[in-house]
């Protein structure tokens, strides 16, 4: 069992730590206002936390007139966080400071269908290597956040009937990693972590938004009233299996015409292969000849170079995802939709096709102020979100492993 440095703090002190984490460099006055504390109470609590080494002063904020306020942050000397982003075909692991700055990071190909034993054994090795690279040992890890591409029972840290990774069903990632680390370990769906990452970047300034990840699969992270919404069984946001064509191809879930089988990365690759082999695109035929296969990125590159067949593929994928998204926009009425995952490397034409489809199909009231854009955190959204999960939940459980 791990005991965090803050395990014996009062409720008010814990509130201050949480607020400091989410404000990412707020002032004493700002903390007092957010928490409804008097200035004298906030100053006394902050002074105590600085003295105990929990908080640190981090320079001055820009002046808005008058004396420049001092910024506060969690003391990086307390320890580090570990973020793990398990993708369907990739693995990212990072050691992060308490301000979510990346201290060390590694990314490599991985095949989630190899099963949890193979993938998580590699995760163990990479975490150890990164900690050594940072000159740290396991005792400095305050929390570990893990994202996986499937539904998760959040309380148990287990996957539940994950379509892309059936061998992981009911496997406890938490128990596996606990053999090496006493720090609390938290597991969530990968797109939920992307949503958490954006929520932290925004300092919770947006309360209702969506994050759509398009890669090997398609998923959605839902932020409702400033919190990630997971649903009754952890499967909220599994939008990849919304039907967009009843006569479409069969999905791996068993149904026909799911948007995932028609517009995700493998579908884009399949359409590109057909165009190359059918003589519709010389550019993609050349790529196929040179590489033996075509990646979604290659389609994007051909599209940006003006290849008509590539443009048609990108627009079709964007239009189908926009068709799916329009229903969700009508239902949920988000202020923003952020799109992430490997699809972002395809370029602006895909985003334009998504926007056009959503605005055409959604109610005017739902789209009047809607913004649709690529996720500003880019490829690191999942890792940052894993760090947010680790810190947020470690503070919630006071560092005691659940």
Positions of predicted regions on the chain:
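ATP-binding/phosphotransfer module of carbohydrate and carboxylate kinases, centering on a glycine-rich
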Residues: 1-60, 64-140, 181, 246-247, ...
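Phosphate-binding/catalytic loop of phosphoryl-transfer enzymes
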Residues: 83-85, 98, 142-270, 385-402
């Amino acid at each position: 069992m791990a005991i965090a440095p803050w395990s014996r703090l009062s409720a008010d002190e814990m509130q201050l730590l949480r607020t400091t984490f989410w404000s990412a460099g707020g002032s004493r006055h700002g903390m007092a206002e957010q928490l409804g504390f008097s200035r004298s109470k906030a100053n006394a609590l902050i002074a105590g936390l600085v003295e105990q080494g929990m908080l640190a002063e981090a320079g001055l904020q820009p002046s808005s007139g008058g004396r420049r306020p001092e910024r506060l942050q969690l003391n990086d000397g307390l320890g580090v966080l570990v973020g793990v982003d398990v993708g369907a075909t990739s693995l990212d692991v990072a050691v992060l400071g308490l301000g979510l700055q990346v201290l060390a990071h590694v990314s490599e190909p991985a095949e989630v269908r190899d099963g949890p034993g193979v993938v998580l054994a590699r995760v163990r090795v990479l975490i150890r290597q990164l900690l050594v690279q940072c000159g740290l040992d396991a005792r400095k890890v305050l929390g570990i956040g893990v994202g996986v591409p499937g539904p998760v029972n959040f309380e148990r840290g287990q996957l539940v009937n994950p379509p892309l990774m059936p061998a992981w069903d009911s496997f406890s990632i938490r128990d596996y990693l606990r053999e090496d680390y006493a720090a609390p370990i938290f597991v969530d769906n990968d797109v939920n972590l992307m949503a958490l990452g954006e929520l932290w970047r925004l300092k919770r300034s947006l309360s209702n938004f969506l994050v759509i990840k398009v890669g090997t699969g398609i998923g959605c992270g839902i932020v409702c009233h400033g919190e990630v919404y997971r649903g009754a069984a952890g499967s909220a946001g599994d939008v990849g299996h919304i039907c967009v064509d009843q006569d479409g191809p069969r999905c791996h879930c068993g149904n026909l015409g799911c948007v995932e089988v028609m517009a995700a990365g493998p579908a884009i690759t399949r359409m590109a292969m057909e165009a190359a082999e059918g003589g519709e695109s010389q550019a993609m035929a050349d790529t196929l000849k040179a590489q033996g296969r075509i990646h979604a990125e290659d389609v994007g590159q051909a599209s940006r170079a003006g290849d008509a067949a590539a443009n048609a593929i990108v627009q079709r994928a964007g239009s189908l995802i926009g068709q799916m998204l329009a229903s969700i926009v009508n239902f949920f009425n988000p202020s923003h939709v952020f799109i992430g995952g490997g699809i972002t490397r395809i370029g602006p034409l895909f985003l334009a096709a998504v926007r056009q489809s959503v605005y055409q199909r959604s109610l005017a009231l739902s789209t009047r102020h809607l913004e649709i854009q690529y996720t500003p955190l880019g490829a690191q959204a999942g890792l940052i979100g894993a760090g947010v999960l680790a810190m947020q939940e470690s503070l919630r459980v006071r560092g005691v492993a659940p």
